[in-house]
């Protein structure tokens, strides 16, 4: 069979833009250091399970396999999210074709997918979020094909993608709920009389079932995690602020494209379901009042595709031919200068100056103070120095105390840093009360001798016979609460640590 029409037609432009996306990430991959969450995920990957306090197991399982094959250098760690991001660009191009668009529409939509600042952020570091965008985009393409073709094949594919997506991040439930609502509210409801949708739902449920069993066995820790994060960590966001942040996170340059795309989807009898998915998820997030605005970022690929196809159709009229160059100019002239906001392409001092020059400073999405860098970059600084400082305290102890000394970290970033960088400085594994570290327990430490990292300066004094402030962290570009964090040397916990463990649990 001659494959040239496929490569020269439907895939040529998306593949080119996907390659550009990969090139951008390759330029930035080692510019700064390991991100806080990456260090934690590496610790999780050493302890495989069917679930974790703050996420399902799929991305951690992928990381475990990846570490076995290629190690855990920055390049080894980050090629997978970059590939997932490139896959999202490719799927966006295929969505354009499925919606009737041609090469210009593919070029415009895929260019949008490359330049989205928040997608650049999540595709730079290893996390479930890069795969989440990929699964949402692929699910949208398969849903459209399933509704168009009426065959079982696309429905089976959709079920598998939904199931894997759920094993990656439970927010895939929003897609499933939005798709079900869209089918019920449109003429596509007739497909509910066929096997396809029910088979897809069954497959997704079966794939997700082991994680549900894990949740039951562990007392539904993720529900506690979500409740605490919503109440104590997320910033309250109103309707206007939510949509203002959508425009900012997705880039003002891309706003006209996705707005046209949303209108085009809702006006389309054939693809209205995809528009309803977006609207229903957005409505849910706005109604919650405290969700992070970037949660909706996973749902934009169909909007870019539909918007680009609509602009291409409108520009087919000679009187509106100007739409093509104007659309490309807006996307490029405004979108390109924002790339260093999403990717650490610049040395840190130049980034600080550049962000001040263009007036970009992201609004905090959590209840924390920002430093000179936004949190997505600040959390890449200070971790090895933290381990080095803890090691100095640890090795200052007599051998008898070192043998029973535990290192208790206030949060999973600090604990992950001790676990990752600690072996080169002769440190034992860390323990922590934060998220999945709490499930791993105190590991036999009694509290007789503890090095406590982080927290408030008055935290441990009432619990120990002796408390010494041994050192403090010092990192210019890290998050302010990590700079100057105390490192305590504590002796004589007033009760066994195993007994205190339940009291100090913190899921958020």
Can you describe what each PLM-predicted range is?
Residues 47, 110, 142, 154-169, ...:
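Membrane-interface alpha helices of multi-pass inner-membrane proteins
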Residues 46, 91, 112, 131-149, ...:
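Specific aromatic-rich, kink-prone transmembrane helix
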Residues 164, 173-270, 286-289, 340-344:
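Transmembrane-lumen/periplasm boundary regions of multi-pass, lipid-linked membrane glycan transferases
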Residues 79-100, 138, 142:
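Transmembrane-helix motifs of polytopic, lipid-linked glycan transferases
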Residues 313-355:
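Signature aromatic-anchored transmembrane alpha helix within multi-pass, membrane-resident enzymes
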